[in-house]
């Protein structure tokens, strides 16, 4: 376990987020660059719980409050039907489908959102899938190994 009590830096800022285990803390990381900021959030609870925890009403408003230009975002599951043998409420992650409903189509001034951290069952692994196409058509991105970000 890594504790962030009294951890300070001007360039990497831990941002606490709720997650299913109550025995330890979960954090996203905000990297402050010379020209842009990148928020890495590969794991958190439902949007309802996370937004309540950070006192925001929408993911985009939260990202704006963090001054995030690029967001690497939890894309573990496409939807709640993805796991055949386990109910989705037992595996706390917001679905990409739910995230898209909240952020809608990318508009001027919105951060660059890149979905990452995919479960092996997620159809976003396949560029020819309708789900992959939907994310791209809405102006968002699918992370791929080796991507680099300049901040």
Task: Briefly describe each language-model feature range.
Residues 37, 45-146:
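Cap/insert and terminal regions of metallo-dependent hydrolase folds
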Residues 1-58, 64, 146-151:
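Core dinuclear metal-dependent hydrolase active-site scaffold
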